[in-house]
Amino acid sequence: MGAFLDKPKMEKHNAQGQGNGLRYGLSSMQGWRVEMEDAHTAVIGLPSGLETWSFFAVYDGHAGSQVAKYCCEHLLDHITNNQDFKGSAGAPSVENVKNGIRTGFLEIDEHMRVMSEKKHGADRSGSTAVGVLISPQHTYFINCGDSRGLLCRNRKVHFFTQDHKPSNPLEKERIQNAGGSVMIQRVNGSLAVSRALGDFDYKCVHGKGPTEQLVSPEPEVHDIERSEEDDQFIILACDGIWDVMGNEELCDFVRSRLEVTDDLEKVCNEVVDTCLYKGSRDNMSVILICFPNAPKVSPEAVKKEAELDKYLECRVEEILKKQGEGVPDLVHVMRTLASENIPSLPPGGELASKRNVIEAVYNRLNPYKNDDTDSTSTDDMW
């Protein structure tokens, strides 16, 4: 289940890059969790004749970070170096790629199992994996677990991966056929995902193949033909993001942020902060990959954003002045603002996405501010 800190760790790891007609940014934050178990991969230009291909992935570890870390360093090699992926001479076909991805997952899982056995089963960790392999003609969505990826095309969610949960009928059938059960929506009442890399305690049913175990390492792979005119961006994120934001919400929020800044790291940081303030208690990681026709910065949107920030600053000042000598706490300020009809809040993010703006004004104007106050708590905020 995971243990929690008294205060969230809000320091972020960031990266960004560009190439092959793509731009990407990423952000990850430990948040309320005692350990940071997420990992990620971002590679533009693959080796072995695949210079025009790119690969991105997010790994959400559980019961430790070992599997997530190993996969972020080695999964891509297992995918692109197996014979199913390479196929015959020339560029791999769509079926080569899909089969190679599946083979790569099974191979790395078996490799990690052997390594774990050599250590007498010392590593009990596991990890989800969600990724995209982007060729000049296709985008291959890859998913194993309950992290999620989506494609925004022509201002709408065009595709999103399906979470692998034990309560899903097909997943539940496999679990039961392997002698397991689904209780409180968990495998044997314990694990909240039905597919993952690692988790070898759930992969030891004799007489069953690797994809027939209580927990399967087999990914779902979907190939989507690229559309130069309509493809805008891809979001890959762990469930710490999706727990508090739906597909359309996050798509709308990211699109609105891209209209006010072209800094993809900043956009990802805003996603992570907003999800923290919406109540996410998990590690959070997000990768944003933009195609050439992603939304561009709009002077009108920038102006509206500045006007909104100014409006919020004035309202915070008014709320503080109205209280006279007794300065209200930040929770009271946020609740007051939440009860108002504030125009032009970012879609999907709403007031939570402006928490940093509100808090900065509050701290500047509050003469009694205690630096030890836990201003990051979201308990009972709304």
UniProtKB/Swiss-Prot annotation:
List of residues binding Mn(2+) 2: D60, D239, D282
Residues holding Mn(2+) 1: D60, G61
Q: What SMART domains does the entry give?
A: PP2Cc
Q: Any idea of its EC number?
A: 3.1.3.16
- Respond yes or no to whether keyword rRNA-binding is given for this record: no
The PPM-type phosphatase domain covers 23-291
User: Which residues are listed under lipidation as N-myristoyl glycine?
Assistant: G2
Q: Which cofactor does it need?
A: Mg(2+); Mn(2+)
In terms of domain of life, where is this protein from?
Eukaryota
Q: Which residues carry this modification: Phosphoserine?
A: S375, S377
Stated membrane topology is:
Lipid-anchor
Q: InterPro entries in the record, alphabetically? A: PP2C, PP2C_BS, PP2C_C, PP2C_C_sf, PPM-type-like_dom_sf, PPM-type_phosphatase-like_dom
Q: Which GO terms describe its cellular component?
A: cytosol; membrane; nucleus
Q: Where in the cell is it found?
A: Nucleus; Cytoplasm, Cytosol; Membrane
Q: One GO molecular-function annotation for this sequence?
A: manganese ion binding
Give me the comment on cofactor binding. Binds 2 magnesium or manganese ions per subunit.
Q: How is it modified after translation?
A: N-myristoylation is essential for the recognition of its substrates for dephosphorylation.
What is any Pfam family matched here? PP2C
Q: What does it catalyze? A: O-phospho-L-seryl-[protein] + H2O = L-seryl-[protein] + phosphate; O-phospho-L-threonyl-[protein] + H2O = L-threonyl-[protein] + phosphate
Output the GO biological process annotations, alphabetical, semicolon-separated: N-terminal protein myristoylation; negative regulation of canonical NF-kappaB signal transduction; negative regulation of non-canonical NF-kappaB signal transduction; positive regulation of canonical NF-kappaB signal transduction; protein dephosphorylation
Q: Which keywords describe this protein according to UniProt?
A: Cytoplasm, Hydrolase, Lipoprotein, Magnesium, Manganese, Membrane, Metal-binding, Myristate, Nucleus, Phosphoprotein, Protein phosphatase
Q: State the CDD domains in the record.
A: PP2Cc
Its quaternary structure?
A: Monomer. Interacts with SMAD2; the interaction dephosphorylates SMAD2 in its C-terminal SXS motif resulting in disruption of the SMAD2/SMAD4 complex, SMAD2 nuclear export and termination of the TGF-beta-mediated signaling. Interacts with SMAD2; the interaction dephosphorylates SMAD2 in its C-terminal SXS motif resulting in disruption of the SMAD2/SMAD4 complex, SMAD2 nuclear export and termination of the TGF-beta-mediated signaling. Interacts with the phosphorylated form of IKBKB/IKKB.
Q: What does this protein do?
A: Enzyme with a broad specificity. Negatively regulates TGF-beta signaling through dephosphorylating SMAD2 and SMAD3, resulting in their dissociation from SMAD4, nuclear export of the SMADs and termination of the TGF-beta-mediated signaling. Dephosphorylates PRKAA1 and PRKAA2. Plays an important role in the termination of TNF-alpha-mediated NF-kappa-B activation through dephosphorylating and inactivating IKBKB/IKKB.
By sequence similarity, the record places it as follows: Belongs to the PP2C family.
| Protein name, UniProt field | Protein phosphatase 1A
**Annotated organism of origin:** Oryctolagus cuniculus (Rabbit)
Taxonomic lineage from the root: Eukaryota, Metazoa, Chordata, Craniata, Vertebrata
Gene name, Swiss-Prot/TrEMBL = PPM1A
